[in-house]
Amino acid sequence: FVNLSERVIAVKEIGESVAYREYELLRNLVRLGAPCVTPTAVITERADLSGNALNSVLVTEHLSYSLPYRALFSQYMRPETATRLIDALAVLLVRLHLLGFYWGDVSLSNTLFRRDAGAFAAYLVDAETGELHTEGLTQGKRLYDIDIARTNIIGELMDLQAGALLEPSVDTVEVGDRIVTRYTDLWEVLTGAETFDMGERWRVRQRIERLNK
């Protein structure tokens, strides 16, 4: 992170073609209203003081009041922190998939979190492996993203336990499985088809209540 004229920016060093690709992906996601960081620039033809070539960098705006998951666990070392982060990540993943975005590397590490009325809101911060499909995602791509998320989350939680940031009693596999169930439930509520008779308005109210939850 770099302080620049009362602004904070994030600088990510990557190859030139990858930097331009991620920049365009993030721009398109911002245009679509996705919860993600805002790209600012790609800087190329960099060199150190000795004249040696350096990789290009992608510059993004720092997301105010956001924290990476490790910082949150260092502040709130409670088992429920893990489940709340998973719930936030599930909401983010559903929103991205509805926009036709395949992430390709879903993880807590590639996400920033903000506190939101006792819960957390999640934001995509790394789109390097992503793909935007204007025609929508296939079920195969959605399920693969979920499987990647589960695997990565379990590994990240185990790493937190090894670093004494998460209680040993927490079942990391069970928490990792939660991303699958939460995503599946939310996706079904948002996209599932239901048929109502004229006299079953209570089912409409019930559907709205599920959406609000």
Feature-to-residue mapping (PLM):
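Hydrophobic residue at the +6 position relative to the catalytic HRD Asp in the kinase catalytic loop
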Residues: 106-113
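Surface loops and adjacent helix of pleckstrin homology
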Residues: 14, 116, 136
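Conserved ATP-binding subdomain of kinase catalytic cores across diverse folds
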Residues: 1-83, 87-104, 120, 152-154, ...
